[in-house]
């Protein structure tokens, strides 16, 4: 587990005392989970990555890995504890004159691990990333996705509990991106890793993350599980992760629906239609498998029959069925009726 608390980072600047790049970031990533960190260019993602990997010392705050504050360490103590955090960058940064096996073995050799143990462990790592048959291949003989797999194996060589993946899929083709994301999820489950996935691609977040945090101008502005964000009508991050295309529609009431935080009745449309004599048009929908539950966001237009229930009654009934509803448009006659 990694726990980041009130993390701040500032730099000296000409004509000013300091420039504050990170402004009190707090974030917890449990074991066996992937948290994506998103945000625009200049938001502070790269600085956060440097602080997490302890390439930069935070100005204040703490970075705890398995309960120990690494941000207060220095020298040999810091170098020893830094092994708990493996890092994968956009470029795999492999040594071109060394084979895949030799690149993965480097951290172990620097640590002084005995050759027999190195051979055993590197073999296991190559198997873990699906490259057992590429042990003797040089980087130039590997595809971009395969090189990134070697980089991931090398990051895991010292058996970290935290893996930082900084734009690890940027620049890869769609097939390689899919394979790397699938690999990260497999490694999360196999080794119980806390994975921090820094990315600017919302599709990567949707496909791999359990939770997501958004940074803007050095502040942590939103965070939550994908299910929570998708099922929250007020979440701007959820709307960007799971967008709906605007459509022209007519009806007595136009609703935006979100679900996923509670069990959903699968026959909710027929239940409502029969109970209140409604005609429901599905205008747009975005449904994702989040963990073991379906979560979704949709827009519907509702035309009432002769019964015409109060719109508050309809929204309450939707809630009882496991759906959160937000009114986007309401006919004047219904507004007057309440």
Protein language model regions, located:
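Catalytic Walker B motif of ABC-type/P-loop ATPase nucleotide-binding domains
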Residues: 163-166
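Helix N-cap at the start of a conserved alpha-helix in ABC-type nucleotide-binding domains
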Residues: 174-176
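ABC ATPase NBD coupling module
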Residues: 15-17, 70-86, 110-115, 229-233
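Helix-to-loop junction immediately C-terminal to a conserved catalytic motif
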Residues: 53
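Short coil-to-helix segment of the ABC ATPase nucleotide-binding domain corresponding to the Q-loop/switch region
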Residues: 98-105
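Conserved signature/switch motifs of ABC ATPase nucleotide-binding domains
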Residues: 137-140, 158
């Amino acid at each position: 587990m990694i726990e980041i608390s009130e993390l701040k980072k500032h730099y000296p600047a000409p004509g000013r005392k300091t420039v504050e790049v990170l402004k009190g970031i707090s974030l917890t990533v449990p074991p066996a989970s992937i948290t994506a960190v998103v945000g625009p260019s200049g938001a502070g993602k790269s600085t956060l990555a440097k602080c997490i990997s302890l390439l930069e010392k935070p100005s204040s705050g703490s970075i705890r890995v398995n309960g120990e504050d690494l941000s207060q360490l220095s020298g040999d103590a810091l170098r020893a504890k830094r092994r708990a955090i493996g890092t994968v960058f956009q470029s795999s940064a492999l040594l071109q004159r060394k084979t895949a096996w030799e690149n993965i073995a480097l951290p172990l050799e620097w640590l002084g691990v005995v050759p027999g143990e190195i051979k055993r462990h590197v073999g296991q790592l190559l198997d873990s990333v699906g490259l057992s048959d590429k042990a003797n291949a040089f980087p130039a003989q590997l595809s971009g996705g395969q090189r990134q797999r070697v980089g991931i194996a090398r990051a895991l060589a010292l058996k970290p509990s935290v893996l930082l993946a900084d734009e690890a899929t940027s620049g890869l083709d769609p097939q390689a991106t899919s394979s790397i994301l699938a690999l990260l999820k497999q490694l999360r489950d196999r080794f119980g890793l806390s994975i921090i996935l820094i990315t600017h691609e919302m599709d990567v977040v949707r496909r791999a993350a359990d939770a997501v945090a958004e940074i803007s101008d050095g502040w942590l502005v939103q965070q939550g599980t994908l299910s929570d964000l998708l099922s929250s009508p007020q979440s701007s991050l959820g709307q960007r992760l799971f967008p709906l295309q605007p459509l022209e529609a007519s009806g007595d009431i136009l609703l935006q629906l979100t679900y996923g935080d509670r069990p959903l009745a699968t026959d909710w449309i027929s239940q409502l239609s029969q109970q209140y004599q409604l005609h429901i048009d599905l205008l747009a929908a975005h449904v994702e498998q989040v963990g073991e539950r379906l979560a979704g966001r949709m827009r519907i237009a509702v035309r009432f029959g002769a019964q015409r229930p109060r719109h508050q009654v309809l929204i309450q009934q939707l809630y009882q069925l496991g759906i959160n509803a937000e009114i986007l448009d309401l006919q004047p006659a219904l507004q007057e009726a309440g």
